[in-house]
UniProtKB/Swiss-Prot annotation:
InterPro entries: HD, HD_metazoa, Homeobox_CS, Homeodomain-like_sf, HXA1/B1/D1. Sequence-specific transcription factor which is part of a developmental regulatory system that provides cells with specific positional identities on the anterior-posterior axis. Acts on the anterior body structures. CDD domains: homeodomain. The gene is HOXB1. Transmembrane segments: none annotated. It comes from the Eukaryota. Residues 213-272 bind DNA. The keyword Transferase does not apply. PANTHER family: HOMEOBOX PROTEIN HOX-B1 (PTHR45946:SF5), HOMEOBOX PROTEIN ROUGH-RELATED (PTHR45946). GO terms for cellular component: nucleus. This is Homeobox protein Hox-B1.
Amino acid sequence: MDNTRMNSFLEYAICNRGTGAYHHLEQSSPSFPSCSGSPSSDTFHGEGAYGAGGSPVAAAHLPPQSPGFFPAPPGAPSLRGRCPERRVPNPKLQPRLRHHQLYLGQQDADAVYFQAAGYSSSTGPHLGSLAEGYCGAVGQYQQQQHLYGQEQPSYLPGVYGNLSPSLNEDKDPACPSEPCPNASRARTFDWMKVKRNPPKTAKVSEYGLLGQPNTIRTNFTTKQLTELEKEFHFNKYLTRARRVEIAATLELNETQVKIWFQNRRMKQKKREKEGLAPPAASRSAKEASEASDQSNCTSPEASPSSVSS
């Protein structure tokens, strides 16, 4: 088999991936794909083996090379027919490394997978010619990102610098001026001045009360209690005239007599409910029968005038 045809087949299979084979890299991050026997070139058309497939139309849609990269000097050795030598970066010059997983494309089932290290912008100018010769201008990833819908985060310091003002603007603004809680507490509204309940020391005429709320409990004497019990035995409810008369006799006021009768009636109802005292109806009927018996026994005899008549 002809080796020339085999080499051209390998070149076409590896490098002629179309515009989709470009990997979205940083401006300062060169990539090292697998070996290709094609020389580095500043143009994307010619042999058709430099990422654009030799299509002038595809090359026309690609943006110009990034100004951060410099072409290879004229006296640089040709890299055709041999693989580029992988260089290990100096950890002192570049302490931070970010690794990107790169695929040459999805058109072939046996797509070559490899891993390349991304370097900062300090090593970009030195390796720019080498990356440009094998993968084209790296600054084209932004255009391809919009063309093929591949969204990848940008790690460029300049992009972060541009985004930082917007991030600062997205932060919560300063707290608006609000009334201080201490000031609101110190402020007294008109509705707070209204007193819902009258004080205990209020005057009777001011609120129209029948008696003072802070009335002291009355301590009745034995004589007063005996007279009140006698009156309650005959009359459960007193008239106004009888209440005034009893109050004057017992040296009490009218309100004290009225309240005592109210409490005595409630006490009587409680006793009847508990069964400690007979109901008032049976007791009144019994008293009425006893009164009728007494009237019959003490009824006066007929007068002599009525008998003679």
